[in-house]
Regions:
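Short, low-complexity N-terminal intrinsically disordered segments enriched in polar/charged residues
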Residues: 23-52
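Bacterial N-terminal signal peptides that target proteins for export
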Residues: 1-10
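Short solvent-exposed beta->alpha transition segments
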Residues: 30, 37-41, 55-102
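A generic structural signal for ordered secondary structure
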Residues: 45-49, 72-76, 135
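Bacterial N-terminal signal peptides
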Residues: 9-19
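Exposed beta-sheet edge and beta->alpha loop/turn motif
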Residues: 97-148
């Protein structure tokens, strides 16, 4: 029950966040090449952790705000298993563009889920005070016209 409530809160927050006007600028000018590489690496590392069912590692790439919402790595991984199957067990992942929004960088990925359907994953990134990048949320949309 707690996981379902947390998932609903996270999904509602992401929906509200996305409903605001966003500035979409390809390849954010305020991000250095090392920042862009770090963002890619953080997301790939979390995807790799999901493949290993390494809850602690996957959880470590989430921002403190996200970690606080789920309480521990086990709850976080359970939420991903239930609500984000395409990124939990993707058949394929292709990194697309990194766009700048008024809420921060959004790394777009094209994912083929285990069901064979195509999805677009938006990874919202946040730079921490120590200079590292962490995942501040993810939302998925299904590409209705693309099945594999």
């Amino acid at each position: 029950m707690m996981i379902q409530t947390a998932c609903r809160i996270l999904l509602l927050a992401m929906a509200l966040w996305m409903s605001g006007p966003a500035l979409a600028e390809d390849t954010p000018s305020n991000l250095t090449a090392p920042d862009q590489q770090a963002i890619h690496q953080v997301i790939q590392s979390q995807l790799d952790a999901f493949q290993r069912d390494d809850a602690a590692a996957a959880y470590s790439y989430a921002t403190p705000m996200i970690r606080e919402k789920f309480g521990d790595a086990r709850n976080f991984l359970q939420m991903v298993k239930q609500g984000y199957t395409p990124v939990y067990r993707p058949k394929s992942v292709d990194f697309d563009k990194l766009v700048d929004t008024e809420y921060g960088p959004d790394q777009i990925l094209h994912v083929i889920g285990p069901d064979g359907h195509a999805y677009t994953a938006h990874y919202m990134m946040q730079k921490q005070t120590d200079g590292t990048w962490m995942i501040n949320g993810c939302y998925l949309t299904r590409a209705e016209d693309q099945n594999v």
